């Protein structure tokens, strides 16, 4: 998620610069096509331009946008790869696609780098959680480029301290409702990937796991301990949905509705990605957050750019953040078991070299440049995408941009990954269909149904619901 966005003029300039560079004659005319999601085009284009300058003309990296939606991105890449598209070089892959692209032979293992440098570069100075998402069957097929983790966001003016467990979340919401105060727990619970992320985090935090490490066996109910973890995760989801004063629209919620529920004064607790902080500050500066009137703060005048996006100076960001702490704060994601840290499901992108690339040596070198420490700093500080390089979390510039840096680093070190399997899309779809609507969850029955449905996905049986 972005914390800061480049203006339209800057975006146009960057796109033009990238296109012009790609038409040049550097490296004997070698162009490495770099496919990334469209919603972060400005950041990825800017970093490609930086690499073109750093590479000294030996070859050129050209950013090309994939669709905004993850499913459409995957479909386009799959079609290009199965069609043997030789213009495909470097691919930005969602963290859940590694197994599928590796198993299909679409992504080259990093050990295939002709220079022999890819594995060491991907491994050194990279956080453990993101690195795990780039592996399949203990082999690296990609190098992490961006990552993300959810935190707990809460109204500091409504409680003395944030809850540390989900049982505590429900108890706090119940107390607030009884006092006539905002009491919703904002989550992502409609039938989509966000619901799978929530369930996976609860399950892993309870000591469970969807699949065995080889991705072939469903492990939700195979042992007494695993069944207990699955049932506990489902009990929490049902409790959040049915708590006194719960969000009546909870079965239709996603990241956006969760953010708005807090900004509109309806939710006191929220689990969501770090983008909610800059969003809260931006809307408060615009006068859209009644309990945080930053539009009345003179030192924030001019912090909105020509298109109405919050683009503060460092001093303005600090002033806005300090003011917000009176009513809005963040804390580690709530755990399931008392005294134990949550294992939060991470998001992000990994860079892989396509099997169809005609310039493998240059493609692997491009990845090393795109994720070097300086370009990672730019991606994080200017682009608002959390870094995968461990050393950046000690960087004062990064820390100023990410006040939550210590929590983010800790959670990314002990992160949960989504089930690793070449048929992840089928598994994910069956999980979300079985869980929705969460108001109808019967923990024991739903645990058994999840096991049946996910095994069907693994076995390739039947149509996806």
Where do the model's predicted regions map?
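A structural signal for short loop-to-beta-strand junctions that line the ligand-binding cleft
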Residues: 78-80, 87-89, 119-156, 334-344, ...
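Conserved N-terminal structural module of periplasmic/extracytoplasmic solute-binding proteins
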Residues: 2-99, 116-119, 295, 299, ...
């Amino acid at each position: 998620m972005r914390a800061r966005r480049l203006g339209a003029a800057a975006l146009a300039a960057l796109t033009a610069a990238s296109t012009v560079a790609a038409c040049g004659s550097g490296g004997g005319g070698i162009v490495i096509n770099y496919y990334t999601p469209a919603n972060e085009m400005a950041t990825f284009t800017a970093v490609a331009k930086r690499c073109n300058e750093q590479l000294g003309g030996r070859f050129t990296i050209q950013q090309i946008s994939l669709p905004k939606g993850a499913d459409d991105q995957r479909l386009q890449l799959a079609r290009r790869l199965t069609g043997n598209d030789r213009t495909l070089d470097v691919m930005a892959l969602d963290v859940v696609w590694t197994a599928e692209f590796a198993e299909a032979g679409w992504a080259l293992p990093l050990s295939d780098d002709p220079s022999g440098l890819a594995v060491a570069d991907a491994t050194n100075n990279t956080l453990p959680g993101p690195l795990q998402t780039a592996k399949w069957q203990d082999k690296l097929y990609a190098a992490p480029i961006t990552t993300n983790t959810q935190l707990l966001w809460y109204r500091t003016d409504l409680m003395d301290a944030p809850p540390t467990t989900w049982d505590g979340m429900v108890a706090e919401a119940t107390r607030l409702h009884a006092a006539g105060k905002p009491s919703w727990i904002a989550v992502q619970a409609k039938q989509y990937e966000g619901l799978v992320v929530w369930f996976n985090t609860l399950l892993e935090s309870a000591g469970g796991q969807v699949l065995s490490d080889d991705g072939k066996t469903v492990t939700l109910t195979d042992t007494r301990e695993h069944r207990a973890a699955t049932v506990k995760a489902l009990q929490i989801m049902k409790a959040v949905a049915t708590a006194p004063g719960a969000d009546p629209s909870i079965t239709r919620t996603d990241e956006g509705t969760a953010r708005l529920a807090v900004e509109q004064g309806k939710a006191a607790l929220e689990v969501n990605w770090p983008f909610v902080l800059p969003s809260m500050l931006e809307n408060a500066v615009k006068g859209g957050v009644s309990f945080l009137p930053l539009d009345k703060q003179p030192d924030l005048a001019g912090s909105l750019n020509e298109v109405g996006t919050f683009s503060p100076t460092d001093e303005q960001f600090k002033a806005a953040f300090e003011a917000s702490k009176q009513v809005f704060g963040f804390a580690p994601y709530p755990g399931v078991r008392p005294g134990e840290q949550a294992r939060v499901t991470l998001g992000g992108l990994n860079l892989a070299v396509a099997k169809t690339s005609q310039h493998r040596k240059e493609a692997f070198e491009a990845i090393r440049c795109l994720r070097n420490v300086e370009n990672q700093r730019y991606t994080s500080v200017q682009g608002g995408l959390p870094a995968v390089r461990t050393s950046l979390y000690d960087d004062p510039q990064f820390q100023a941009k990410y006040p939550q840096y210590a929590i983010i680093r800790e959670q990314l070190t002990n992160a949960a990954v989504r089930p690793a399997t070449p048929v992840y899309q089928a598994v994910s779809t069956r999980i979300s269909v079985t869980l929705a609507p969460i108001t109808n969850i019967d923990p024991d029955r739903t645990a058994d149904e999840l096991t049946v449905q996910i095994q069907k996905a693994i076995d390739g049986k039947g149509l996806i619901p």
